[in-house]
Amino acid sequence: MRNSWIKPRLGQKNITQMNFAKNGIITEEMNYVAQKENLPSSLIMEEVARGRLIIPANINHVNLEPMAIGIASKCKVNANIGASPNASDINEEVEKLRLAVKYGADTVMDLSTGGVNLDEVRQAIIKESSVPIGTVPVYQALESVHGSIDRLTEDDFLHIIEKHCQQGVDYQTIHAGLLIEHLPKVKGRITGIVSRGGGILAQWMLHHFKQNPLYTRFDDICEIFKKYDCTFSLGDSLRPGCLHDASDDAQLAELKTLGELTRRAWAHNVQVMVEGPGHVPMDQIEFNVRKQMEECSEAPFYVLGPLVTDISPGYDHISSAIGAAMAGWYGTAMLCYVTPKEHLGLPNAEDVREGLIAYKIAAHAADIARHRAGARDRDDELSHARYTFDWNKQFELSLDPERAKQYHDETLPEEIFKKAEFCSMCGPKHCPMNSKISDETLDQLNNKLAKCDIKV
């Protein structure tokens, strides 16, 4: 779809959506996004230029269907997939991608760390995907030196970052905000550093006693991203891994650096979103969202959860969806899903489904709470179908039609029950929706009540 859009841009020094927007140019991607979001193209351009909205769209991801992440657009959901040294293969990861897109993932991150050829699995995912693909390049940087931190050089990081751009990765998590002077601040934590990328860079800095190379070479990374229109997802290496550690000095010190890096990327006209926690008590979620907006000049916020309890292994998709809905309501632009396997193991296809549906509910609830235009239309349509016992319409409008039909059919599987004015909960005699009272009857009652001087 995008070949004809991209061809005229080839050879230009800076082909980012932000660069075009700052120069008053509405790109085809901006027009496409405007139609999807039901917003004016001019507003999309203005928000991209301001940095409050991003369109992750690498020029080498030609089968991408552009989408927007930002405060002006609907709340989005990301799904993580990826092979590990102990589980999965390329075909399984591609199948997870298909399932993620089927159940509504707006973007997908390939977090593969081993067990397969990382280049091959990434290429297969990008080729198959119509949604933006994100990666964490430090994983492959470490894998490229067989896990030897002492052999990992600054140039190794940049080489892998450019390779991901060349392959068509739309956004990359760059853990540039973790500085060597931040490391002592984790001393009082229960769970220390829980970011894999942050852990790798912490080890690198301690071994070499040098500053984070992703920070010192940040402008070089910006130059790479300009050539491909790759977007920064600035990683939060010091995100809290438990409620005890939430909103501590370590997290907030890194957040301040992420704000600095956001503005440095914008000076290069490179798009940015900023990653956030993590594990956060409900009463601290609003503070975390507001603080990110303040420190990072309203760049789109992208949070993992946050989980609002630490005692829900096996059900962390529920614990985190509660926090995600609140974060979305307060203005978070994208929610990174959590599956039932969080903290326990590598998610399988069914875990991907469970996590995604939980997060589509959270994002949708946030859009309703923020009074997005048309956000509640589908809810109202389903409610009308429910009241008229249009079972097939109810299934169709559900976030997971297959699951809704499956649960209905467990007790009433015959086709005749798709027209029945009851389900197995109340049966044919006790469903309150069968006791329909006409508007005419209610008007007559209202008149009688008025004559009796009964206030209603």
UniProtKB/Swiss-Prot annotation:
InterPro entries: ThiC (IPR037509), ThiC/Bza_core_dom (IPR038521), ThiC/BzaA/B (IPR002817). It catalyses: 5-amino-1-(5-phospho-beta-D-ribosyl)imidazole + S-adenosyl-L-methionine = 4-amino-2-methyl-5-(phosphooxymethyl)pyrimidine + CO + 5'-deoxyadenosine + formate + L-methionine + 3 H(+). Binds 1 [4Fe-4S] cluster per subunit. The cluster is coordinated with 3 cysteines and an exchangeable S-adenosyl-L-methionine. GO terms for cellular component: cytosol. [4Fe-4S] cluster binds at C423, C426, C431. One of its GO terms (biological process) is thiamine biosynthetic process. Pathway: Cofactor biosynthesis; thiamine diphosphate biosynthesis. Its EC number is 4.1.99.17. Its cofactor is [4Fe-4S] cluster. Zn(2+) binds at H279, H343. It comes from the Bacteria. Keywords: 4Fe-4S, Iron, Iron-sulfur, Lyase, Metal-binding, S-adenosyl-L-methionine, Thiamine biosynthesis, Zinc. It holds the Pfam family ThiC_Rad_SAM. Substrate binds at N80, M109, Y139, H175, S195, R196, G197, D236, S237, L238, R239, E275, Y302. The keyword Secreted does not apply. GO terms for molecular function: 4 iron, 4 sulfur cluster binding; carbon-carbon lyase activity; zinc ion binding. Belongs to the ThiC family. Catalyzes the synthesis of the hydroxymethylpyrimidine phosphate (HMP-P) moiety of thiamine from aminoimidazole ribotide (AIR) in a radical S-adenosyl-L-methionine (SAM)-dependent reaction. HAMAP family: ThiC. This is Phosphomethylpyrimidine synthase. It comes from Prochlorococcus marinus (strain MIT 9515).
